[in-house]
Amino acid sequence: MAITYSIGDMLTKLRNASRVGHGSVDLKMSNMNKSILNILKEEGYIKDFNFLEKKGIAFIRVLLKYDNKRNPVINKIDAISTPGRKIYSSYRNMPRIKNGYGILIISSSQGVITGKEAKDKKIGGELICSVW
């Protein structure tokens, strides 16, 4: 079965792998996934990611991050927009995640950025996911 919604697939794999304590997880390569992972790395939710190829198919290997007690750093990661229901927001109406402790990832005219960056730059966009 072909995966048609790579963002949702990526978020589900990250959520499941971190809950069971895996050290890494392999995701299908896409530019959107790469942009989202860049933000997760900058914000400290994952250790790192690198690119690999299996049988001619490009993958991204994500190294997951845990605290000292081996609890996952990603407590919750949820998709907001889906292929059947796109949700957009202006910078004025950008929702706060966990009272400012989480992050919102959006796709804007200036690329994939966090909700905080969107407010600072005064641009809106499609709400992709929330992480805390």
From Swiss-Prot:
Keyword set includes Metal-binding: no
Biological-process GO terms, alphabetical: translation
GO MF entry, a single one: rRNA binding
Entry's Gene Ontology cellular component terms: ribonucleoprotein complex; ribosome
The entry's keywords: Ribonucleoprotein, Ribosomal protein, RNA-binding, rRNA-binding
Family statement drawn from the similarity comment of this UniProt entry: Belongs to the universal ribosomal protein uS8 family.
HAMAP family: Ribosomal_uS8_B
NCBIfam families noted in UniProt: PRK00136.1
Function, in words: One of the primary rRNA binding proteins, it binds directly to 16S rRNA central domain where it helps coordinate assembly of the platform of the 30S subunit.
Protein name: Small ribosomal subunit protein uS8
Native source species: Borreliella burgdorferi (strain ATCC 35210 / DSM 4680 / CIP 102532 / B31)
Annotated gene: rpsH
